[in-house]
Regions:
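Hydrophobic beta-strand residues in large extracellular and virion-surface proteins
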Residues: 1, 36-38, 46-48, 67-71, ...
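Long, low-complexity ectodomains and other extracytoplasmic segments of secretory-pathway proteins
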Residues: 1-40, 92-109
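Beta-strand-rich interaction surfaces with strong enrichment in secreted/lumenal proteins
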Residues: 22-24, 57-61, 74
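Short, solvent-exposed loop/turn segments enriched in Ser/Thr/Gly
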Residues: 28-35, 76-87
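Surface-exposed binding patches on compact interaction domains or structured appendages
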Residues: 41-66
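Intrinsically disordered, low-complexity acidic/polar segments
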Residues: 45-46, 78-80, 95-97
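A generic beta-sheet turn/junction motif
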Residues: 52-54, 77, 92-94
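Extracellular/luminal low-complexity segments enriched in Ser/Thr/Pro
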Residues: 66-80
Length: 109
């Protein structure tokens, strides 16, 4: 399984047990969105859940080997660092899989 950042067209590195997407420094009220792709074999049954309401994930099945997920951090009106998680549950080749994506960054003036 691969998770690819569509903005940079690069594979997201896995750190121990999770994938990390660093939004970096964001300006206050800036839109913080990133679309990623999960690539694998016979992907199905995707569900996603965020650890708080300030993080949103919108999955879309492209084909049996590709799922796209738009990730959004919605609290950019607050100037502070953030580190949120999105949990993905799905099956690859009929085997259950779980992937955790950390979304982090810093909102500044």
């Amino acid at each position: 399984m691969q998770i690819i950042d569509k903005q940079t067209n690069t594979e997201i590195e896995k750190s121990t047990d999770r994938y990390i997407i660093n939004f970096g420094i964001l300006k206050k009220n800036q839109i913080a969105k990133r679309t990623v792709q999960i690539k694998g074999n016979n992907l199905e049954g995707l569900t996603s859940q965020s650890d708080c309401s300030c993080t949103e994930s919108s999955p879309e099945v492209i084909d049996k080997n590709t799922i796209e997920i738009e990730l959004q951090y919605k609290n950019t009106h607050m100037t502070k660092p953030f580190d949120k998680k999105v949990y993905l549950n799905f099956h690859e080749d009929k085997q259950p899989k779980v992937a955790t994506i950390n979304i982090k960054g810093q909102v500044t003036l």
